[in-house]
Amino acid sequence: MKTSINYLPEQKRDDLRRIVECVLEVLPDCEMIILYGSYARNTYVDYDQRIEYGIRTCFMSDYDILVVTSTRFQRYIINHILSKATDNYYKGKNRYASTTVQFIDESIDDLNKAIDKNRYFYTDIKREGIMLYNSGRYKLARRRKLNYREIKELAEEYYNDRFERANDFLRNAMYDKNDERYKICSFHLHQACENYYNSIILTFTLYSPKEHLSLIHISEPTD
């Protein structure tokens, strides 16, 4: 895994170093801190404003950070700990003008199981991510070739998740149509189509294309 962030501007490098400090201050159990997503791929967007489906939107890429621990924490505990890290990171910053940090967390055992089972989200992180901190006490697993039963189980899991998500968007679109909110209806229809499409892609390939931009503001629909 890569370790250098020298391709990023100095301010971004300072932000990431501060994020590492903030996590380690509140989480002694931390084993690895990994930058993934658009900042790891150097495809990030600092700020972009556009109009999509009649809605004015502003986009800013997040710092996507995977925190790996030796312990499997209960969800509310690790969320509380990482909230402290987030608050400490924003001290002295204009929170609304700063790049947002988004944490996800996994225990080293769960992360290695996910990599071993070829879960694309985690294998992509291993392939494209940047190791910001490593205690040196653990190693990441290697993905392996799955047998037919494992492939079938994973395909069914992905299909059910994405297809139901698409159904939710479609239901929202129908509500919007009934309320004559046609612009937001078109947005929900687009999301439904995208998830129906991805449910097919995931079922047959066990992989989904990357798309990660954070919506930081939605104003009223434009005329």
Residue spans for each PLM region:
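Hydrophobic alpha-helical packing segments in soluble, helical-rich domains
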Residues: 185-207
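Conserved NTP/Mg2+-binding pocket subregion across the NTase superfamily
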Residues: 2-11, 88-171
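Short gly/ser-rich loop at a beta-strand->alpha-helix junction or flexible surface loop bordering the NTP-binding
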Residues: 31-45, 49-52
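Residue-level detector of conserved catalytic or cofactor/ligand-binding positions
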Residues: 214-223
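Metal-dependent nucleotidyltransferase catalytic core
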Residues: 2-26, 46, 52-115
